[in-house]
From Swiss-Prot:
Protein's recorded name: Olfactory receptor 4K14
Natural source organism: Homo sapiens (Human)
GO MF annotation list: G protein-coupled receptor activity; olfactory receptor activity
Record field: transmembrane: 26-49, 59-80, 102-121, 141-159, 197-220, 237-259, 271-290
Record keyword S-adenosyl-L-methionine present: no
This protein's encoding gene: OR4K14
Subcellular location: Cell membrane
Residues exposed to the Cytoplasmic side: 50-58, 122-140, 221-236, 291-310
Superkingdom: Eukaryota
Listed InterPro entries: GPCR_Rhodpsn, GPCR_Rhodpsn_7TM, Olfact_rcpt, Olfactory_Receptors
Length: 310
């Protein structure tokens, strides 16, 4: 299409989760409560890890604190706007705001994928090589793992936004989701996006699939090692691994389903995106603290310290 014959789109229309006014009122209350719970739960983990010397000196809890920080960002890139849009008849987002959503989703999402692999490696060393744990999971190693997750997330998001922001958007501007989902946005471009879809598969799909396979291998090795131990000594390790596997499944399953097939869309995709953008950040604090006696003891200590100061 000749650039002289069209005007560029300056904003996009988001369809949201539903069109029913009654459901939107319910979703406003529900997701507002969920978002508050996400922020408070992850903030509590972050503050507990930072304030407790035993926790913030442990590689496992250092990584967990970083996961809580990323979850707060992952839940905040689109959820506040979605909540506000439940009360609005027109769900508009500017072009710049749309690109920002794509950037922060892939930045935090990519970083969290790599961080979850690092946490699986930490559990592998703790369970399979306990005598070498402090050597293999030194502070230098932990910092490198966290920095690697942030660098991968940043490079991944830049690579996604770089080709998306320069596409010509001149026709339809309606996105059938509650945020600017990359596969839906590039389909609005006034050009053939088949090659871009292939690029997206080799980027988002490859990142999520490779991290997921690494996690599967790690936890398979861990579970096999646990089975070889005496029954009485495996309960804590098995509980920890089960919690991690649950997080991995809830986070990676929807991501892989959505991003490895950008040329086809299903109505369930919109609901699946709720899992990795909202429910995973909500469940992480619960899963990682529910059976973790050290974390619960540190939280009680933090609460007692607060009562003492009052």
């Amino acid at each position: 299409m000749d650039p002289q014959n069209y005007s560029l789109v300056s904003e996009f229309v988001l369809h949201g989760l539903c069109t029913s006014r009654h459901l939107q009122n319910f979703f406003f209350i529900f997701f507002f409560g969920v978002y508050v719970a996400i922020m408070l739960g992850n903030l509590l983990i972050l503050v507990t890890v930072i304030s407790d010397p035993c926790l913030h000196s442990s590689p496992m809890y250092f990584l967990l604190g970083n996961l809580a920080f990323l979850d707060m960002w992952l839940a905040s890139f689109a959820t506040p706007k979605m909540i506000r849009d439940f009360l609005s008849d027109q769900k508009l987002i500017s072009f710049g705001g749309c690109m920002a959503q794509i950037f922060f989703l892939h930045f935090t999402g990519g970083a969290e994928m790599v961080l979850l692999v690092s946490m699986a490696y930490d559990r592998y060393v703790a369970i399979c090589k306990p005598l070498h744990y402090m050597t293999l999971m030194s502070w230098q190693t932990c910092i490198r793992l966290v920095l690697a997750s942030w660098v991968v997330g940043f490079v991944h998001s830049i690579s996604q936004v770089a080709f998306t922001v320069n596409l010509p958007y001149c026709g339809p501007n309606e996105v059938d989701s509650f945020f600017c989902d990359l596969p839906l946005v590039i389909k609005l471009a006034c050009m053939d996006t088949y090659v871009l879809g292939i690029i997206m598969i080799s980027d988002s799909g490859l990142l999520s699939l490779s991290c997921f396979l690494l996690l599967l291998i790690s936890y398979t090795v861990i579970l096999l090692a646990i089975r070889q131990r005496a029954a009485g000594s495996t309960s804590k390790a098995l509980s920890t691994c089960s919690a991690h596997i649950m997080v991995v499944t809830l986070f990676f399953g929807p991501c892989i389903f959505v991003y490895v097939r950008p040329f086809s869309r299903f109505s369930v995709d919109k609901l699946l995106s709720v899992f990795y953008t909202i429910f995973t950040p909500l469940l992480n604090p619960i899963i990682y603290t529910l059976r973790n006696e050290e974390m619960k003891a540190a939280m009680k200590k933090l609460q007692n310290r607060r009562v003492t100061f009052q």
